[in-house]
């Protein structure tokens, strides 16, 4: 991404509208977006330094392997707090902590922190789509309300998508730790435990790649839902590109 942006004289970053995908690719994309945001608000210069590539490439799984081998049952008796909410510690928490250590805590924010920047178009919108294990549907997560994707104008919706803010409308969903959303989209079996949402009955999440590994289906739904808006801006020669990320190579 750094090379691509450099090759067109820093014109690439300004033309990204949507980031979608699955697994570790979304973690790297989130870090890249965070660096773009810090550039916009004056915290740092352009993010073309190899230092940042090295940060996101650092080991993150050895700590999880150690916890698995020593049995993390005892760890679950511990808890931590974020934004006034208490959470049980597990291997997933260790994953997040290692990610923050590797990236200088740049991603240690709430999901809602990014809402005004996405709304103003300063940074691309990120949509995460972890798989709901209970029924196989996708949970669409963003700092913004995505009900325009989950509802269908012609009433032919397959109901395969669940909107995060609608599901957790009584739990102040935007207060969730952003790294927990990253983990939800990249929770691979046996490596990390499933994420359990505070619902009755409990909703459990796994890797987004189970349903939409490259974010292609979600991108098409996004485009279809906003087709009138896109047509309007195309008439005025205002264009932005959509970019899809995934950590898997086929």
PLM regions with names:
Residues 1-250:
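Catalytic domains of lipid- and phosphate-ester/thioester hydrolases
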């Amino acid at each position: 991404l750094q090379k691509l942006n450099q090759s067109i004289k820093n014109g690439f970053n300004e033309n990204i509208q949507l980031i979608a995908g699955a697994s570790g690719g979304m973690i790297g994309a989130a870090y890249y977006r965070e660096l773009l945001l810090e550039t916009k608000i004056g915290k740092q210069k352009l993010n073309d330094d190899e230092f940042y590539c090295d940060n996101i490439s650092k080991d993150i799984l050895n700590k999880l392997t150690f916890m698995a081998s020593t049995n993390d049952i005892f760890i679950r008796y511990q808890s931590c707090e974020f934004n006034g909410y208490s959470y049980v510690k597990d291997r997933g928490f260790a994953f997040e902590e290692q990610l923050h250590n590797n990236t200088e805590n740049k991603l240690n924010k709430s999901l809602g922190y990014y809402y005004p920047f996405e709304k103003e178009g300063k940074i691309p919108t990120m949509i995460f789509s972890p798989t709901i294990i209970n029924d196989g549907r996708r949970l669409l997560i963003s700092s913004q309300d995505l009900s325009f994707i989950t509802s269908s104008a012609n009433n032919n919706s397959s109901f395969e998508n669940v909107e995060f803010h609608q599901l957790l409308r009584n739990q102040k969903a935007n207060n969730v730790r952003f790294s927990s959303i990253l983990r939800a989209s990249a929770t691979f079996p046996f490596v990390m435990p499933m994420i359990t949402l505070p619902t009755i009955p409990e909703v459990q999440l796994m890797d987004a790649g189970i349903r939409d590994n490259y974010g292609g289906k979600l991108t098409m739904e996004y485009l279809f839902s906003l087709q009138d808006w896109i047509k309007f801006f195309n008439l005025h020669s205002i264009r932005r590109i959509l970019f899809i990320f995934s950590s898997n190579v086929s």
